[in-house]
């Protein structure tokens, strides 16, 4: 069993502690809006984020070209500089393609890589391990594994994560598995920095030893996540629990009714942060009923929408 020290505020975690899984803004004609992406990145850092995940699931990476992915990495890195960590979503279900994209991201100067479980192929656990190890060995950048079986179609077994933790470049895990026992096993047997990949599970995962969150809802509530995460790192459960409850209706608004990128773009547009709500197919705009449900949740959270 790994000897894990109590996580504390101020420690220099490789990727920070409050990370937003950024949307990719588009222009009305469907082209990537790099200027809006840079402005959004700057706002998120101003609001309390110390890490940004660029072109992950929420960034609609599966409908971006390689050049668009790379353009987003550069736009965000240029905008925030050293104010926060920029983690590039370079994982695909093609190991060779992922390696190529990761190498090009490294040339741009990103601070790390987010590598998702290879989706659709449904490899064995040995194949999953080999996939991650090959990508992690291809650059000098630190790597965050992304375990999200609901989208990938297959989970990374805790035993596989434990084996992968021995790779010198694999330092973190974005846990979107919603399997507390699996997460507990990983935390008890590795020194990985574990991040909640489910916004609403940030508090319980941090109670077990996670260091923070990679959040979609942080687009519109980064300051509140900063309070929750810092309180948990400091052992102040009362403050963290209060923030957890205050975040609940906002999390529901962003994550419960439509795909997270769709909801986040609408709320950011309502706030005047993004100029439009454009997403790429197969994502589509919410219905009026869905939009009203989102507004109802936001009003419950004290927002005037």
What do these predicted regions represent?
Residues 3-20, 24-153, 161-163:
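Active-site beta->alpha loop and helix N-cap motifs at the rims of alpha/beta catalytic domains
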Residues 37, 69, 73, 98, ...:
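A general structural signal for well-ordered alpha-helical segments in protein cores
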Residues 31, 57-60, 90-92, 198, ...:
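Gly/Ser/Thr-rich helix-start
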Residues 27-30, 36, 68, 123-124, ...:
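Solvent-exposed, flexible loop/coil residues
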Residues 3-10, 14-24, 43, 47-49, ...:
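C-terminal alpha-helical cap/extension of soluble enzyme domains
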């Amino acid at each position: 069993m790994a000897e894990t020290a109590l996580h504390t505020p101020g420690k220099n975690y490789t990727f920070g502690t409050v990370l937003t899984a950024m949307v990719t803004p588009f222009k009305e004609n469907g082209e990537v809006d790099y200027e809006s992406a840079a402005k959004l990145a700057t706002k998120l850092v101003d609001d309390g984020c110390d890490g940004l995940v660029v072109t992950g699931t929420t960034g609609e990476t599966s409908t971006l070209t390689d050049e668009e992915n790379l353009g987003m990495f550069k736009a965000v890195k240029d905008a925030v500089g050293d104010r926060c960590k920029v983690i590039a979503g370079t994982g695909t279900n093609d190991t060779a393609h992922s390696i190529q994209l990761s190498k090009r991201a490294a040339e741009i100067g990103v601070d790390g890589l987010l590598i998702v479980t290879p989706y659709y192929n449904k490899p064995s656990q040995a194949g999953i391990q080999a996939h991650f190890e090959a990508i992690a060995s291809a650059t000098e950048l630190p790597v965050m594994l992304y375990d999200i079986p609901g989208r990938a179609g297959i989970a990374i077994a805790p035993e596989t994560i434990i084996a992968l933790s021995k790779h010198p470049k694999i330092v973190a895990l974005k846990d979107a598995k919603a399997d507390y026992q699996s997460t507990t096993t990983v935390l008890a047997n590795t020194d990985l920095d574990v991040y909640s990949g489910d916004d609403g599970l940030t508090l319980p995962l941090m109670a077990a030893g996670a260091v923070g969150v990679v959040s979609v809802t942080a687009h519109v509530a980064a300051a509140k996540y900063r309070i929750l995460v810092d309180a948990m790192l400091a052992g102040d459960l009362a403050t963290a629990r209060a923030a957890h409850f205050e975040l609940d209706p906002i999390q529901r608004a962003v994550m419960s009714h439509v795909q997270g990128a769709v909801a986040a773009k609408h709320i950011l547009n309502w706030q005047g942060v993004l100029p439009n709500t454009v997403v790429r197919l197969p994502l589509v705009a919410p219905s009026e009923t869905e939009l009203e449900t989102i507004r109802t949740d936001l009003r419950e959270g004290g927002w005037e929408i």
